[in-house]
Amino acid sequence: MDLLSQIVARAKSDKQRIVLPEAEEERTLCAADRALADDIADIILIGNPAKVEALAKEKGLQNIGKATLIDPENYDKSEELAEKLAEIRKSKGMTIEQARELVKNPLYLGCMIIKTEGADGQISGALSTTGDTLRPALQIIKCQPGITCVSGGLLLISKQKQYGEDGVLVVADVAVTPMPDANQLSQIAVCTAQMAKAVAGFKEPRVAMLSFSTKGSAKHEVCDKVIEATRLAKEMAPDLKIDGELQADAALVPSVGAKKAPGSDIAGKANVLVFPNLEVGNIGYKMVQRLGDAIAIGPVLQGIARPVNDLSRGCSVDDIYYMIAITACQAMDAKK
């Protein structure tokens, strides 16, 4: 069974409630129909009922009736949620009038439904910007305990089966935090290992903190940051298998790892790679994807207390369908 099939199977094993606040968008509705047909999640759609039903009819979607459909303009819990939102944002000066308007916004409404235990995760981005997706999540759901930094993890599936877990690697940050400091980088490492377990199904994440230096082979403040981040990650998660700083070849190739970092538990065996900054991460994964013909799945947002994921506006129905399954796996993990 390939990785995506494994993720779908895990989602089916313990169905989660996933909010799709862009229900009037064609690809989103088609993905919802497929998810409902395959029984991988309980779907909550937010949108104008007449528009959603007309689109479903136009596209011949047979399963949308199984979803919970919420009209943001006429939701019977809107006032209750507005009062709770005003309380959450009271320190920022939000009034009840402002809160009432915000809960008509499907992205805010979805996050409030999650906050009040009515759902387990949310996916948007087919129409919305990353900022619009993240803003309500950070204002309402907030970060996991002990985490202040949101990041974007990615599943990389390579044809080179000798690397990672049978060719599967989990890498970060590729999407969110441009120049993490040592503390933020340590959080990214811990969250990426967590995602590797929850989504990729790794029994034992082995985290390499990447740099252009291996174990002091070069001296620079950016290497020092990676070394400090490794130390902080070990403090935050004492059972986590992690090492750094390591060059990419030392992290992935056993013979190189043995020469450059003798005695390391991670060198040559890494299945999770943490980049020193977003620039390196984003460029690096896209080069592997294009030049190495690898499959890239994600980014998957990490560090939020309940999963909220962001799609590319160029996403396909398949992308959304698999993100529903990924978000469900994250939601299961968040409840542990």
Which residues does each PLM region occupy?
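Anion-binding alpha/beta catalytic cores of soluble intermediary-metabolism enzymes, centered on
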Residues: 1-267, 272-336
